[in-house]
Design a protein with these regions (language model features):
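P-loop NTPase switch/communication element
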Residues: 1-15, 21-24, 109
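A generic secondary-structure micro-motif detector
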Residues: 15-16, 73
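Conserved phosphate-handling catalytic cores of large alpha/beta enzymes
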Residues: 23-27, 31, 35, 47, ...
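Active-site-adjacent beta->alpha loops and helix N-cap segments on the catalytic face
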Residues: 53
Length: 171
């Protein structure tokens, strides 16, 4: 599991278990382990319906989280805006996570979601690995939208390379 890859505990669940019951078990386990952070990840949705929104609202009421982040696929375009509006109307969102920013889409969904929700984009996902979750830098997204590339991301990648590797290249 992803939790195992990053060395985090996780709570297994079954399909017949209610989300609120899973969340209660997770809260108890987090308290028992004296955890500082508990992440509850709900299933991604392509369509929004009343039953699903009622379920997510009940879950939110059970957990009473400090942060409620809406994760949006940067490649979904107008659908992202519609889904963001529905979630923003139903929940007190505190921020946005823009996923799949390494794809072909330039990031127009980010502008729509930010405008509709009024919430800040806090993180962006580049690739599918946990190392690809980064703080959001508006100037980098603006460069991509304008077709100028993302030099900041390139530079930060280069900065991660160990100096001894570069020494061998230029020796």
């Amino acid at each position: 599991t992803l939790a195992g890859e990053v060395g985090a505990s996780f709570i297994a669940s079954s399909a017949d278990e209610k989300p609120e019951d899973i969340a209660r078990r997770a809260l108890k386990e987090a308290d028992k382990q004296l955890a500082d952070v508990l992440i509850l990840d709900t299933a991604g949705r392509l369509a929004v319906d009343a039953e699903m929104m009622a379920e997510i609202q009940a879950l939110h009421q059970t957990v009473k989280p400090i942060e409620t982040l809406f994760v949006v696929d940067a490649m979904t375009g107008q659908d992202a805006a519609n889904t963001a509006k529905a979630f923003n109307d139903a929940l007190p969102l505190t921020g946005i996570v823009l996923a799949k920013t390494d794809g072909d889409a330039r990031g127009g969904a980010a502008l729509s979601v930010r405008t509709i929700t009024g919430k800040p984009i806090k993180f962006m996902g580049i690739g599918e690995r946990t190392e690809g979750l980064e703080p959001f830098y508006p100037d980098r997204l603006a460069s991509r939208i304008l077709g100028m590339g993302d030099d900041g991301h390139c530079c930060s990648d280069i900065a991660r390379i160990h100096l001894s590797t570069l020494t061998g290249v230029y020796a």
